[in-house]
Swiss-Prot record:
It comes from the Eukaryota. Expressed in the adrenal medulla and all brain regions, but not in visceral organs. Keywords: Acetylation, Cytoplasmic vesicle, Electron transport, Heme, Iron, Membrane, Metal-binding, Phosphoprotein, Translocase, Transmembrane, Transmembrane helix, Transport. This is Transmembrane ascorbate-dependent reductase CYB561. Residues 39-52, 108-125, 181-199 are vesicular. It comes from Bos taurus (Bovine). It is a multi-pass membrane protein. Heme b 2 binds at R74, K81, H88, H161, K226. Its cofactor is heme b.
């Protein structure tokens, strides 16, 4: 009798790309904190610094944690599918909660200062991204974690789930870049063109954000780095294929 199949080995370069993405993500979070601390006075909830909670939370939630959530199926290649699903979903929950705190912070700050809401391109994109993120999580939970969805429905929806997950992540990064530029223009005005230290730091932060997104997207699009099907997943896939071809799965 044959022994159990040995777990598939991760492609050689994958761990290095994942490690590089995490290094970039941590640097982005640290640089965001440094920018807010050095040039915007830091963060606080009950003061004029409440606005600064917004960019930090959005970078942590909708950029760093969302990117990590997308990598779960690449990093945990041989763990049980249920475990990876739960981790994938939980990371999105953490990202959503942190982003929600950031969203509340900016609306509270605007209310206290009497500023207008939702007039800029950044704010429109932000609301769109937040709504899409929440909808994606709800639909994903219904199909992949809630026990009522059939295997056939999951199989049909999976490509859309993967595509919109990556698209929402890229939109999140683009929205963060818009917000970064908007914050610089409001604060620095014409001094932005004079290579002010804050502007240079924020520009480097923007480049690192774009690089982080590029590395995440590259990892996701490498077909040979996809999570291999486990034995039980292969059996379900074969049974579904047999059913769709008009036969019944073998009962032997």
């Amino acid at each position: 009798m044959e022994g159990p199949a040995s777990p598939a080995r991760a492609p050689g370069a994958l761990p290095y790309y994942v490690a590089f993405s995490q290094l970039l993500g941590l640097i982005v979070v640290a640089m965001t904190g440094a920018w807010l601390g050095m040039y915007r006075g830091g963060i606080a909830w009950e003061s004029a610094l409440q606005f600064n909670v917004h960019p930090l939370c959005m970078i942590i939630g909708l950029v760093f944690l969302q990117g990590d959530a997308l990598l779960v199926y690449r990093v945990f290649r041989n763990e049980a599918k249920r475990t990876t699903k739960v981790l994938h979903g939980l990371l999105h929950v953490f990202a959503f909660v942190i982003a929600l705190v950031g969203l509340v912070a900016v609306f509270e700050h605007h209310r206290k200062k009497g500023y207008a809401d939702l007039y800029s391109l950044h704010s429109w994109c932000g609301i769109l991204v937040f709504a899409l993120f929440f909808a994606q999580w709800l639909v994903g939970f219904s199909f992949f974690l809630f026990p009522g969805a059939s295997f056939s429905l999951r199989s049909r929806y999976r490509p859309q789930h993967v595509f919109f997950g990556a698209a929402i992540f890229l939109l999140s990064v683009a929205t963060a870049l818009l917000g970064l530029k908007e914050a610089l223009l409001f604060e620095l005005g014409t001094k932005y063109s004079m290579f002010e230290p804050e502007g240079v730091l924020a520009n480097v932060l923007g480049l690192l954000l774009a690089t982080f997104a590029t590395v995440i997207l590259y990892i996701l699009t490498r077909a040979d780095w996809k999570r291999p099907l486990q034995a039980e997943e292969q059996a379900l896939s074969m049974d579904f294929k047999t059913l769709t071809e008009g036969d019944s799965p073998s009962s032997q």
